[in-house]
Amino acid sequence: IVTVDCSDYPRPVCTLDYMPLCGSDNKTYSNKCNFCNAVVDSNGTITLSHFGRC
């Protein structure tokens, strides 16, 4: 199982780094920060599907 530690999130500002992750909502997030903010916003219903684009 692939996991990402989102314990330091949410953050008000994310960098523009491009290291894509694919969420369980089948959406590609540009980096860990954007993904983790979405996880927090979804109350943990979004999980990591895999690294890279969906």
Swiss-Prot record:
One of its GO terms (molecular function) is serine-type endopeptidase inhibitor activity. Disulfide bonds join C6-C36, C14-C33, C22-C54. Gene3D superfamilies: 3.30.60.30. Glycans are attached at N43. It is found in: Secreted. Residues 4-54 form the Kazal-like domain. It comes from the Eukaryota. Avian ovomucoid consists of three homologous, tandem Kazal family inhibitory domains. This is Ovomucoid. It comes from Corvus albus (Pied crow). The lineage of its organism: Eukaryota, Metazoa, Chordata, Craniata, Vertebrata.
